[in-house]
């Protein structure tokens, strides 16, 4: 049954993770260049001092990935093609894990992700802050974001205030006249989610939860100090580049740009008159965002675009390939820089930027990013996830690993709905959870 059919606001919410037993979690990362299914075993552990919010050890017991088809710049363009790729990826993961998958946590890149901060306040009359007061102010803030054509993916309280004093993490039992909250809400077009759910359902699977791609990749690639002090995670995928900003242990901003590694490939194919497949190989083997002195002398063979035996490969300098690659990379990084500046969170990001995603592996990218962003830059890989094959330990698998981590941190979210409040933990079908239980777990 569709989770869009029963409630205007109802998106699937994950079941709570018991702190005393293990869980099997299945995730699906749908991207423009690849589709990844992972099956993991989550085992209770003491909370990590380095990795934020990790309450369980994650061990991957099954993984399957296929070259993506039917997705362009994060948007589903061919349901039949994508359905087939999903089936193959899930089947490979099931065979490796020795179990059957019924439902998955899925990432969301399309649908014009929007990130907004909503503020609400209520009068306390000098009384003590009670659980009911928290409920009222949280619902008031979250309800401001409700739109007929958009669905709430994430709603995270980023901070409270009492009588104008900001930066309060837990106001419960404190006294004041005015209680306020700042709520970060990530929304997405409902039609994009419907198409995503439809495609998963056609593969005879159900959607257990949905997570914004920038949130997932940040969860996998950032360490505790970065999440607390402020940092931007830039996920450079094949069709899109997403931005997530974390501070004080919370996701506080997301954004997306319709440029990625595949745009570099198409630039090479056009500029060098070669096939997409050959351009991709050129990018991986010879592509760089930095010129060096020998590039003008080094010659590279470019296969012709046709199949005529009389067509001979052309010879171009490595410098020409680098100039084509560098132009698109610089454009993307300049857009990222401008988006961070426009967001108003540039001071919070400070000097810390983490690059992740498959396109972040391009030679010379960190150095170019440091120059354009004027910040310290490192490449982020999935951390704290055991059992990954060597090929899946790189930045390209950060989103999939972040989806595996997400159930451990989902309890910080709240979702308002028709005068009540959604906990992120329901029965998987959008059932309204008890507010008291959420408040007990959160405070």
Curated annotation (Swiss-Prot):
Entries under Pfam families matching the protein: FtsA, SHS2_FTSA
Membrane topology term: Peripheral membrane protein
SMART domains reported in the protein's UniProt record: FtsA (SM00842)
Key words of the record: Cell cycle, Cell division, Cell inner membrane, Cell membrane, Membrane
A single Gene Ontology CC term: cell division site
The keyword Membrane is annotated on this UniProt entry: yes
InterPro entries the record matches: ATPase_NBD, Cell_div_FtsA, FtsA/MreB, SHS2_FtsA
Gene3D superfamilies per the UniProt record, alphabetical: 3.30.1490.110, 3.30.420.40
Major localization listed first in the record, in broad terms: membrane
Biological processes annotated in GO: FtsZ-dependent cytokinesis
Calcium listed as a keyword: no
Subcellular location: Cell inner membrane
Superkingdom of this protein's organism: Bacteria
Subunit record text: Self-interacts. Interacts with FtsZ.
Family: Belongs to the FtsA/MreB family.
NCBIfam families hit by this protein: ftsA
Function, as annotated: Cell division protein that is involved in the assembly of the Z ring. May serve as a membrane anchor for the Z ring.
PANTHER family: CELL DIVISION PROTEIN FTSA (PTHR32432:SF4), CELL DIVISION PROTEIN FTSA-RELATED (PTHR32432)
UniProt name for this protein: Cell division protein FtsA
Gene encoding the protein: ftsA
């Amino acid at each position: 049954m569709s989770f869009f059919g029963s409630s205007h606001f109802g998106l699937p919410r994950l079941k709570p993770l018991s702190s005393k037993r293990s869980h099997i979690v299945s995730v699906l990362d749908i991207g423009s260049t690849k589709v990844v299914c992972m099956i993991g075993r989550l085992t209770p552990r003491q909370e990590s001092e380095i990795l934020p919010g990790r309450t369980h050890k994650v061990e991957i017991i099954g993984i399957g990935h296929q070259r993506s088809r039917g997705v362009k710049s994060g948007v589903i363009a061919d349901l039949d093609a994508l359905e087939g790729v999903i089936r193959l990826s899930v089947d490979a993961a099931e065979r490796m894990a020795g179990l059957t998958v019924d439902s998955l946590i899925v990432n969301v890149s399309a649908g014009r992700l929007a990130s907004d901060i909503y503020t609400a306040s209520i009068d306390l009359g000098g009384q003590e802050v009670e659980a009911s007061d928290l409920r009222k102010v949280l619902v008031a803030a979250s309800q401001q974001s409700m739109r007929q054509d958009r669905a709430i993916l994430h709603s995270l309280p980023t901070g409270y205030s009492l009588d104008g004093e900001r930066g309060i993490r837990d106001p419960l039992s404190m006294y004041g006249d005015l209680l306020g909250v700042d709520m970060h809400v990530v929304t997405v077009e409902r039609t994009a989610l419907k198409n995503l759910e439809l495609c998963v359902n056609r593969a005879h699977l159900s959607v257990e939860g949905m997570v914004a791609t920038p949130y997932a990749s940040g969860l996998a690639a950032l360490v505790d100090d970065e999440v607390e002090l402020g940092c931007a995670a830039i996920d450079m995928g094949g069709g899109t580049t997403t931005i997530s900003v974390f501070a004080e242990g919370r996701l506080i901003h997301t954004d997306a740009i319709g440029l990625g590694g595949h745009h570099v490939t198409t630039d090479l194919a056009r500029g060098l008159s070669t096939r997409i497949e050959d351009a991709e190989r050129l990018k991986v083997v010879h592509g760089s965002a930095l010129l060096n002195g020998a590039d003008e002398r080094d010659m590279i063979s470019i296969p012709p675009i046709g199949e005529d035996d009389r067509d001979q490969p052309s010879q171009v300098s490595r410098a020409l390939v680098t100039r084509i690659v560098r132009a698109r990379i610089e454009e993307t990084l300049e857009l990222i820089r401008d988006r961070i500046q426009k967001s108003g969170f540039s001071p919070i990001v400070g000097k810390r930027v983490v690059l992740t995603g498959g396109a972040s592996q391009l030679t010379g990218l960190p150095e170019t990013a440091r120059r354009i962003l004027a910040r310290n830059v490192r490449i982020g890989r999935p951390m704290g996830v055991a059992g990954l094959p060597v090929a899946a330990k790189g930045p390209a698998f950060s989103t999939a690993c972040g989806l595996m981590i997400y159930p451990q941190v989902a309890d910080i979210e709240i979702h308002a709905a028709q005068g009540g409040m959604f906990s992120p933990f329901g029965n998987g079908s959008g059932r309204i959870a008890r507010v008291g239980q959420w408040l007990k777990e959160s405070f």
